[in-house]
Amino acid sequence: MAKPTSKDSGLKEKFKILLGLGTSRPNPRCAEGKQTEFIITSEILRELSGECGLNNRIRMIGQICDVAKTKKLEEHAVEALWKAVSDLLQPERPPEARHAVLTLLKAIVQGQGDRLGVLRALFFKVIKDYPSNEDLHERLEVFKALTDNGRHITYLEEELAEFVLQWMDVGLSSEFLLVLVNLVKFNSCYLDEYIASMVHMICLLCIRTVSSVDIEVSLQVLDAVVCYNCLPAESLPLFIITLCRTINVKELCEPCWKLMRNLLGTHLGHSAIYNMCRIMEDRSYMEDAPLLRGAVFFVGMALWGAHRLYSLKNSPTSVLPSFYEAMTCPNEVVSYEIVLSITRLIKKYRKELQAVTWDILLDIIERLLQQLQNLDSPELKTIVHDLLTTVEELCDQNEFHGSQERYYELVESYADQRPESSLLNLISYRAQSIHPAKDGWIQNLQLLMERFFRNECRSAVAIKVLDVLSFVLLIIRQFYEEELINSVVISQLSHIPEDKDHQVRKLATQLLVDLAEGCHTHHFNSLLDIIEKVMARSLSPPPELEERDLAVHSASLEDVKTAVLGLLVILQTKLYTLPASHATRVYESLISHIQLHYKHGYSLPIASSIRLQAFDFLLLLRADSLHRLGLPNKDGVVRFSPYCLCDCMELDRASEKKASGPLSPPTGPPSPVPMGPAVRLGYLPYSLLFRVLLQCLKQESDWKVLKLVLSRLPESLRYKVLIFTSPCSVDQLSSALCSMLSAPKTLERLRGTPEGFSRTDLHLAVVPVLTALISYHNYLDKTRQREMVYCLEQGLIYRCASQCVVALAICSVEMPDIIIKALPVLVVKLTHISATASMAIPLLEFLSTLARLPHLYRNFVPEQYASVFAISLPYTNPSKFNQYIVCLAHHVIAMWFIRCRLPFRKDFVPYITKGLRSNVLLSFDDTPEKDSFRARSTSLNERPKSLRIARAPKQGLNNSPPVKEFKESCAAEAFRCRSISVSEHVVRSRIQTSLTSASLGSADENSMAQADDNLKNLHLELTETCLDMMARYVFSNFTAVPKRSPVGEFLLAGGRTKTWLVGNKLVTVTTSVGTGTRSLLGLDSGDLQGGSDSSSDPSTHVRQTKEAPAKLESQAGQQVSRGARDRVRSMSGGHGLRVGVLDTSAPYSPGGSASLGPQTAVAAKPEKPPAGAQLPTAEKTNLAAYVPLLTQGWAEILVRRPTGNTSWLMSLENPLSPFSSDINNMPLQELSNALMAAERFKEHGHAPVQVIVSATGCTAKPPTLPRSNTVASFSSLYQPSCQGQLHRSVSWADSAMVLEEGSPGETQVPVEPPELEDFEAALGTDRHCQRPDTYSRSSSASSQEEKSHLEELAAGGIPIERAISSEGARPAVDLSFQPSQPLSKSSSSPELQTLQDILGDLGDKIDIGRLSPEAKVRSQSGILDGEAATWSATGEESRITVPPEGPLPSSSPRSPSGLRPRGYTISDSAPSRRGKRVERDNFKSRAAASSAEKVPGINPSFVFLQLYHSPFFGDESNKPILLPNESFERSVQLLDQIPSYDTHKIAVLYVGEGQSSSELAILSNEHGSYRYTEFLTGLGRLIELKDCQPDKVYLGGLDVCGEDGQFTYCWHDDIMQAVFHIATLMPTKDVDKHRCDKKRHLGNDFVSIIYNDSGEDFKLGTIKQGQFNFVHVIITPLDYKCNLLTLQCRKDGPACKCEWWRQPGEIVVWALPVVMELTVTILLCHLQMASQVHHSRSNPTDIYPSKWIARLRHIKRLRQRIREEVHYSNPSLPLMHPPAHTKAPAQAPEATPTYETGQRKRLISSVDDFTEFV
């Protein structure tokens, strides 16, 4: 509209030019400067005139055209030219002539236009008045040139509009329209009168033409009219119709919309909208779809389009009705455009739409949906439903302001056409009205279920309806459960099993499960019926199904899995709710379904998954003693049901056991008494599940399922109530398990196995179940028991060998009758197992367990014993195995050697020696001379002598041991496969790793090196003690703790004592001087002894000792006077243990009590006789004359070794020299008569003399020195009751025989064994003295009758029978003993030895003769550096083996190890060699004769020299060393404080009900349950503390005066003692609020036993004990007299050492005392050892030693001290070190070897078989 203004300005310029007021418009053609005028000559004119021909004229016109375009013509030349050619325009002229003239006019106008003036009007007139309508194009070209394409109309203004209108009628072309556009733009004011006609004609052209170019140009004209002129109102309808139609042309959409937008922007905008609405509503246009579509488009775009006109104020509400009317006649195009338009409206202006607008929109949408029923247009259908979706999204966003009900009615009406999401929203909307506040809500729910569930095929919609139903049930089921289940659930979901959609079936089943879980009415059965129908579907794949479709088919069976898992959940809930019949039915349904699996052989993965989860749940069922069923919660706590039982009360619980079974099942706990009607109780017989489990074991093909069942069965079998209260056949279970292992096709039927699956994996899974079944052995047939053992034996060749060994160890305890037959073969099979770290602990602990079960191996022959040593010896290799394994191996070797039958032991010594050399010693050999020791094997390839020699002919009393050969060559070959040697490269490569494998903490390099060296020394010391142990026990079973007999006390009291250090032994010789005789006679011993007889007051001594291992056991022992009583606390490890005279420099007191230290002296302190108890003077005078006759020539030899002490009491029978003035020794018989006479005299005189000489003194206090004279102690003294028989025998203390309790009439023993008397006195036990009827005598070779008799002895000790031999033709007397009732565990204990223990030593025999003057003394090389000696007497002569030290000459024959054994006789033969000797004259003459030497009697040196002297001892280290002073005697006393047996202390605590987390309550318990009491009884023997002597019974620090209670339990075997710190037996003091008195004992024990009777889990850390408590052994009582053993270890504890006990899970053992004692004590022994090894790692420089090692180290330290003392006293003597036997090259610049290195080399090179010279 701004263009007319510019035109007005143009007119003003023109007027100015006309008036001369302005400048004319510059002619662009003159821009280049003034052109040269062209002159039209006459000739040119003549050529143009008619005179010339037409062709010449046309030619000349063409030339003039060129000139006119480019040059300026002279003035009036144009007129002349026009006049010359004007005649050619006549109509009759040819077209060429006319065209040439029009072309000339065009050229003149273009070239001379600015000079034409009025000629322009002339030329325009020529064109306008052209005679014909021809030549339109040329005329238009002249017009375009004349007006400059419509821009300049000077001199043409008046007639221009008429000419344009006239031209439009004749030639309305696009070219003209383009000129017209400029005319309208630049000269619109001259066209006003005719504009309406022009618009009309152009609109008609647009409507009629088909040329898009014409339409486009016409639109340009119309646009120019709208923009530069005013469109007439009368032209508006036609204009709009034209545009509405034109908009349908795709190419013209943009210009049409632009034109309409321009129109709507004018004052005619609202009129245009109105006209378009009228068009949409006009019925005459209902069929004109393009027109309606254009109108809809323009209205929508103008009002709410992307480029809407904000000047238009029409609201959507005003135009949408027109849209609705436009849809009166269904038309796809119009409807499509309407949908687009209102979609655009809704999306852009949704927030501004009012409710009335939404109503109209919903009307339009409804009509659209109706039209879709008739219009087959997918595009329209899609866009309409997209519109609905858009509205739906607004509803979701709360931006829909219309009627939601109206909208969802539309959606529901066309639900089948709506997408799932829309229906889901619809269902959600409908669900809002389903609640009790709405009338008819149940009917609405029914309609919803019927409409969208029963008749809906889309899963999502049906699932949504199920969600609505589930939500309704969840919210209001408690009020309307009855109506909902009746009216909706059952009616609508009963078809679920037949539904084709597996997802719907699955969710519907889950809904039924959820509903049934909380349903407690009769409707539960209806719901369960539907669930069972779902479960009844077959899980077998169709036969034609391909493998790739199995996954799809399995997915279609998910509803079955849901049903089964749902039943598991229902059962878990129903188990604890009423009615209990629901749980019973669910349980039966589950079992029935699983049975179908095995009946039809379902093998699909989903079927396996169902079985997997079903078994996973069902195997969690538990039962308590009241037969109530329960399940563990997520924390593992089992909650038992008050309504569901595992059996019926009327069920006969004993009916399960068949007649062929060994036992009937135990009665078990009492049945629960029903608290209500029987209908309230449900019965879930476990036998149903048990039968399914058997089917699983026999038929299951999926390995995951089978593995789960096998892993869960051991824990289920723990609850015996489940098994015994219903007919569950454990025989069948055992048979099924054994069949799995033996059947070759078991692996073939398994699938889903991991890669590399083999029979080993099957064994690994089955063996734990077999282990758990061991506790059911009383209910298994013997055949099944044998099958189990056989399967376990077969598993030894697989990776499960360790588990099998564990199980076999339990079988040994639980099933001795079965294992005893298989044991010989089993032991041989164990030798086939390679010695690996993984098998070390199981094998060694199995052997350790077996060693404590002598009744199992009482029939062992040498082959079996050799197998045991072949198994154990490789594990002594420190380069391969850790410290615990090595220590345990030495422990096993020692136990088995001691338990081995006596005749076999000698043959095993070289075998064990070579094994130790190969496995231990060579590991530390760093010398180049190793060729002699590179023995490939010390296994049974080089078997013991007893296995190599031929079997000797059987004789009655043969001295040769009964040795057997292998009966089969295959057995011999089996032994050859085991090698216990280590090759040189293995040693070199692994020694360093092994030595440093123990965790030494954060120590520096020096401490690490020290720890490594200590570890090396430890292994060498273990070897030394092992060899020393063999030397001690190879020919005898005497205990390691001798006790001086009353005769010895009498003879040796106040005697002279000297001690020599010989190798690693201390030899103490004590000779008699007559003090005992004078004391007997009432004489004053001070006459002979002077001041040396003084005895120190024990109360003045306070001693605190530390023994090895110097750990927790080191406690301060003090004697504190408290009023009238003395409180004595036992020292750890038996500090009060006295072996020999503690201070040998002080003679004995008359009462036989020397100064023994505070504790032992108090215990042995004799009562002082009353003052009036004096002998008559006459008798004293008469008997005094015979004092020298009674005591001369007696001597005691006490040998202290690392493994124990040995004592002999001997008499010198050499007559005195005729030149001597001394009187000969009194014969023993006369001495006995004198003693008996003195005894009778004292009885008549009523004098309580305190010297014990009567063998019947049962009430006498035990003697002070606990020595047992093992060879020649005359303890069986003559009494009148002995019928005058006198014999010489072994000490009663060491004859391991006791009276049999319960048969007092069979035998009577005249003399109580002193050691037994001492032990019984220490324990405070009552004894029965019985008299034997007969005496027996036998040689070392036992007869068959004796064998059979000894094999009947009670288990618990090594059967030993000691033969008694007399001189010459002395009549033989038989001494027989009857077996006894077992009282305790083991036979030959160092201190704690019971009657049964002593009895057990009857098995093997050895002849011991008295020492005669003709005794031959032979000496050979020793065991350990020539320092070990074995004393034995065979036949009728006594041989004393003395091992001197030092190297041998090269001329001697060499031993197998490259060194020649030394052998020479001291008394009869010349020395075999001469060796270098270091003179020590200064030392020998260090002192003059002392006062002790003036004491009458034989000098101890005389006795020592007769036994040990040799002219050639070799080097200095082999020479005996006399202890120089009293300080060293004190060291000997300290050695006596170290017991020769290992000691352990173990805590025992009782946890009652509700005490599992209360430390104070646990410690405050003063008693426990009856089962707890039975358990304590099985731990060991009850002892009374006040009657115990701490030096004889290890108490672990318990006070004997009542501070720590009155009683406790103790246990022992051959080489160890254990005491139990029992919290309930300790006093609970009110003043001790925190129970510190108890914790000071319990907190310092490595291992604690927790008897957990609380019914809850006991957690480690509940008892806040000290840092030393590593392991808890938790005993949980189970039903049917069974206990559960579990281990709890600290994170830093020795769990790894004892882990094999936990491999099968947990151990279930019978609560029988014998079984519990064996199981628990063996386990505790191993745990203690592992704990001690672990604890030593906290101090790497203090490696754990046994008591034997501690004694060995003490002796070695004593040797070093003596050498240092000698060197200090005699500086001229060199400091002696034991030299190495191997000579290093002289040129090698090596450092001087240390003492340890030299000792190590000497030990390696000198370990020989001492049995070669014995």
UniProtKB/Swiss-Prot annotation:
Single annotated GO MF: 14-3-3 protein binding
Tissues expressing the protein: Widely expressed.
PROSITE patterns hit by this protein: RAPGAP
Domain Rap-GAP residue range list: 1532-1766
Sites of Phosphothreonine modification: 927, 1270, 1465
Pfam families with a match to the protein in the record: DUF3384 (PF11864), Rap_GAP (PF02145), Tuberin (PF03542)
Superkingdom to which the source organism belongs: Eukaryota
Name the UniProt record assigns to this protein: Tuberin
